[in-house]
Amino acid sequence: YYLRSLADGTLGYSYKKSAAVALLIRERLGYTLQITIPAVLLSAALGLSWGLVCGYRKNSMGDRLSTGSLIVLNAVPTFVIGLVLMLVFCFQSRLLPYAGLSSSGIVKGSPGYTLDRLRHLALPVLTLTLAALPNRYLLVRNMAAQETDEKYILYAKQRGLSGRTIRWSYLLRNIAQPFVNMLGMSVSVCVGGSVVIERIFSIGGMGSLLTEAVYTLDYPLMQGILFVTTCIMVLSILLCDLICVLIDPKRRREGAK
C-alpha cells in the first residue's frame, strides 16, 4: 500500500487529519522553505567571507575574537538564540512581530503584504542564520589558515598582490569544494532546525506539522515528512556535487573524457 501511495504521489493518507499526506505537506513546505533558503544563503555568504578574512589573518586580534565568539555561539541551543532575539526585538524594542507569518487584517496581494511578510520572517531567518553560521565560519577559517602557509600563497604575497586578491582568487579556489559539499549536507540540518524555530515563532511549516504528527501518532504523516526531507537532502547533495564539477577544472576534464 505504501509503495502504491509513493507511486501515485499521495504519500499515504492521514486518518488523523482526513487528508492525503502529500496535500498536507504541500500546504506547509513553502513556509519552511521561506525560512530555510534565506538562512542557508545568508549563513553561507557570511561564513565564507568572514572565515576567509580571519583565516588569512590568523592569530590576529580580530581572528581570536571572532573565532572565540562563534565557538561560544555554536554551543548555544537554537531555541535560546530565538528567545533572546524575540526578547530584544519584539518585547523590548518592539521593532518586529513575534509570531506567525502575517498580521491580522493584512490580505494577500495588498500593498503592505510583502513588507509585512518580510518583517515576520526576519527573526526566524536571523535565528536559523546565527545557529548555522559558526560551522560555516569555522570550516572556512581553519582551511584558509592552513592554506596561508602554502608556497603559492607566500609567492603571491611576494608578488605584491593585495590581501583581497589573494583571498578571493587563490584561497577561495582551494576551499570552495569542501565548503560547497558541507552546504549540501547542512540543508537537511537547517530543515530539521526549523522544527524548533517554527514552534518558537508560531509558524505553521513542516516542523510544526511533524510535531503534530508525533503528538497524535500519525505514522503515515511522519513517514511522508521524513521521505520529503530525505528527498530534499539528496537533491541538495546532488546539486552541490554538480556545482563542484563546474568549479573544479580537473573534474570537468575527467567528465569530458
What are these regions (language model features)?
Residues 1-48:
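An internal, D/E-rich "acidic patch" concept
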Residues 3, 77, 241:
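Residue-level signature of catalytic and energy-coupling elements of molecular machines
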Residues 29-62, 108-257:
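Alpha-helical transmembrane segments of integral membrane proteins
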Residues 68-76, 80-133:
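Membrane-water interface segments at transmembrane-helix boundaries in multipass membrane proteins
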Residues 16-20, 100-101, 106, 158, ...:
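Short capping/connector residues at structural and topological boundaries
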Residues 26, 67, 98, 168:
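Phosphate-coordinating loops and pocket residues in cytosolic domains that bind phosphorylated ligands
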Residues 10, 92-93, 217, 250:
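A general structural signal marking secondary-structure boundaries and capping sites
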Residues 6-10, 96, 190:
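A short secondary-structure junction motif
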